[in-house]
Amino acid sequence: MAVDTETTTTTIPVTDSDRIDDQNNLTSNAIPHASEKTVPDSPASEQNEVSDESEDKPSKTKKSFGFYAIIVALALTSLLTSLEATITSTALPTITSELGGASLYVWVVNGYYLTQTAFQPFVGQMADIYGRRWPMICSAAMFTIGSGVAGGSKNIQTLIAGRLLQGIGSGGILVLTEIIICDLLPLRERGKYLGMIVSLVGIGAALGPLFGGLIVQYSSWPWVFYLNVPIGGVACLMLFFFLRVRSDKTPNYMQRLRRFDWIGNVLFVMSMVSILIALSWAGTEYPWSSFRVVVPLVLGFVGSAAFVVYEGSSFCVNPTMPLHIFSNRTSGTAFAVTFLHTLSSVSVMYFLPVYFQAVLNASPSRSGVQLLPTILFMIPGAIAGGTLLSKFGRYRPLQHGGLAFMIIGFGLLTLLDADSNTGEWVGYQLLGALGTGLALPVLLPAVQAPLTEEDTALCTATWSFMRTYGFIWGATIATAVFNNRFDVLAPRITDTTIGSQLTNGRAYELATKVFMNSIKDPVTQREVKSVYVDALNVVWYVSLAFAGLGFLLVFLEKEITLRKELDTKYAMEEKKKKPENSEA
């Protein structure tokens, strides 16, 4: 609800539903409540500033057994989705050797990310219309069913279909986990639990390649996917029995369907699919200049522009991604910082294994172990960030601190070379990992602080999308600059045969211990490692630059008081509530 700062009347909201933004610039459709009080000739409200002494006291919400059961179920599903995102990286060669379809293998990985990304805003709107309970249960069930389909596949096409189902389910899980945590806890307390979930996601992503390698080595590849079925089944049952939350129900089924932004969702999904197809082909299947890359990329960006125009038009009654969540300075900046934070951190995590395998001659499994310092220090960083946010209620210092650590850590990576010892490559990872974890759980609260609780589902879905989108572009940009720099430096390799093998986008693919050991001449091997080191330095510098840009953008955010009271119509059902007030 906007407040006219030119008048002498001050509006004091009684509930957090009427949250006004910083600088009173939020022009949303919030409806005034009857409980609002108007105090004439009072001093300007200071509700957006962290000035009250009581604001430093951490909030405490009474938590039932059902609350913790829900958190456990959300943690299990989040762990599985992150594990499944990386587990195929080491298992894929074995899978394709048995199923065939080598020309389609890339979609076993990319299909998962494609549907995971494209359907996130749609799931956010579904949560607004149907409540949180059934969309979450259905997302977890779809992920579990997709895992069963993938595990039981007899050909590559069925495997890809299973991965597409897994992706849709995982996208829903990512969005709804964060939405449900926001429904269960006031804004001041959310960071702590978001930090816990982020930690589990980091553990899953780290263990994925290791689990994939162990499964194909000591068991059979279907268990790469089957392992999700029993655990996912347990999580579904826990959600069914304990995720009892209130729902804003519309009795008429057709009225609910009409509330969906069908045109906007179709435009968004088609645009994202087009962009992601182009990015999956660029630099690997086809050069960036190929029409097979350029055409879908252009169509995707044009479709994205059309989506934005439509969402802001009068024709869109119930937008999937309302533009007012971006027009606010603090939330809009926090979205951008989230994208840059993810892009820079993913670029580093994506290419550290290249350094370990191509430069230090590590095996894939050994490389996974060498990456553990990043994951292990990201986890306490995330927990610390969430805990400090709950205690002090200030997100800007934590964002600045996290991004500063990332800048220093990524800068130190430029010192790595073929002669670096264990202490160096472990130590240099620690600062970047700590900073990545510290900033992550305090980004979503910064988005939500100036917005109303009615915006929770849609702004959370948008934030989750920005994070996933940053992941995709982080890998894409890092790969592009790495390949380009490697091609420029390749003439330094005196053996032209080896040099030609590594150019035109193949340096990343051949960054393995097996390939490096196939180079028998020690001088040539040293030259190749030197080119890898210098090409990787460009990746570290680019990651540093994006983190630096994020650091500067944080100055645009305002430090807004984080709400200590829970004001949502989707809170947990109380035992004495009538059945019609809860989701069936």
UniProtKB/Swiss-Prot annotation:
Record InterPro entries: MFS, MFS_dom, MFS_trans_sf, Sugar_transporter_CS
Protein's UniProt name: MFS-type transporter gkaD
Molecular functions per Gene Ontology: transmembrane transporter activity
Record gene name: gkaD
Membrane topology: Multi-pass membrane protein
GO annotations of cellular component type: plasma membrane
Function: MFS-type transporter; part of the gene cluster that mediates the biosynthesis of GKK1032, fungal natural products containing a macrocyclic para-cyclophane connected to a decahydrofluorene ring system that show potent antitumor activities.
PANTHER family named in the record: MAJOR FACILITATOR SUPERFAMILY, MAJOR FACILITATOR SUPERFAMILY (MFS) PROFILE DOMAIN-CONTAINING PROTEIN
Annotated keywords: Glycoprotein, Membrane, Transmembrane, Transmembrane helix, Transport, Virulence
Biased composition (Low complexity): 1-11
Residues annotated as signal peptide: none
Phylogenetic placement of the source organism: Eukaryota, Fungi, Dikarya, Ascomycota, Pezizomycotina
Similarity field: Belongs to the major facilitator superfamily.
Residue positions the entry lists as glycosylated: N25, N328
